[in-house]
Amino acid sequence: MEIGLREWLILIGIIVIAGILFDGWRRMRGGKGKLKFRLDRSYSNLPDEEGGSAEVLGPSRVLDTHKEPELDESDLPSLSASARDREREPKPVKASKRGKRVSAAADVQQGDLNLSAEQREPDLFADSDDDFAADNNRSSGAAPASSSVKELPPAEEVLVISVISRDEGGFKGPALLQNILESGLRFGEMDIFHRHESMAGHGEVLFSMANAVKPGVFDLDDIDHFSTRAVSFFLGLPGPRHPKQAFDVMVAAARKLAHELNGELKDDQRSVLTAQTIEHYRQRIVEFERRALTQKR
């Protein structure tokens, strides 16, 4: 049997294909389990930076999550808290006693608004700070004595900030009450509002707020129909243990009232309250503390 050219070509092709397949199978078998990669030696010689290798190769770590500060709800003023405070307030027993408190609180006011039909310019400010000091003496005698209330010496200086309404209708009772409750003031002695150390109405009195219109007090029983053209914030010296901090709180409360209820800030000289006036008040506090320290020596 003779093998022709055609048969030889077919046989050679089969042998070549078999060789290729065998070589490929051998390479695949020999390369199993080996990780083929090229190492860039320019990076392998670099020193570790800030523990970077530990961050990559080390075990996983649990990082502390950042917690936002939480606000204690007990520090926030609320209408419910003010309602409970009003329920605990002792009601006047006799009309004569209430009359005394009204007359005493009327003197603490910053001035008198004349709202008669003549529409004259209202006098909102007292002529001197001595009136406030004298009023403190009279109010302490008119108010009922309480063992829990600390007797304070007569005020030698009084820092006054008034807020006058720009609206002809004045400050409406419900809006005014909501605003000052948010600032931490609570209804108390002499039928006016006081800001204590605690927003809940506990601790020493930092400053007070009176009605600038006679009789100078607030009637919570008729607050829905109440309105006033102006109110006065006042801080007596000597008074709180930290008068500068108390004054800053008073300024913040007055500004909040003026901003939210469309009011205008005035000082005790019937002038617009400016940053210079506030700084002058602070200097008066520093000077008073210096004099008090000198007297103790």
From Swiss-Prot:
- Compartment(s) of residence: Cell inner membrane
Q: Where is the composition biased (Polar residues)?
A: 136-149
What spans are recorded as compositionally biased (Basic and acidic residues)? 83-92
Keyword annotations of the record: Cell cycle, Cell division, Cell inner membrane, Cell membrane, Membrane, Transmembrane, Transmembrane helix
Q: Does the keyword Cell division apply?
A: yes
**Membrane-crossing residues?**
2-22
The primary location reported for this protein is membrane
> Does the keyword Cell membrane belong to this entry?
yes
Q: Which GO terms describe its biological process?
A: division septum assembly; FtsZ-dependent cytokinesis
- Which intervals of the chain are annotated as region Disordered? 48-150
GO cellular component terms attached to this protein's record: cell division site; plasma membrane
Listed Acidic residues bias regions: 124-133
According to its record, how does it sit in the membrane? Single-pass type I membrane protein
Tell me the Pfam families matching this sequence. ZipA_C
- Pull the Periplasmic topological domain ranges from the record: 1
Q: Disulfide connectivity?
A: none
- Cytoplasmic-side segments: 23-297
Protein family: Belongs to the ZipA family.
Instruction: Give the matching NCBIfam families.
Output: septum_zipA (TIGR02205)
Q: What does this protein do?
A: Essential cell division protein that stabilizes the FtsZ protofilaments by cross-linking them and that serves as a cytoplasmic membrane anchor for the Z ring. Also required for the recruitment to the septal ring of downstream cell division proteins.
Question: What is annotated about its quaternary structure and interactions?
Answer: Interacts with FtsZ via their C-terminal domains.
Mind telling me what this protein is named?
Cell division protein ZipA
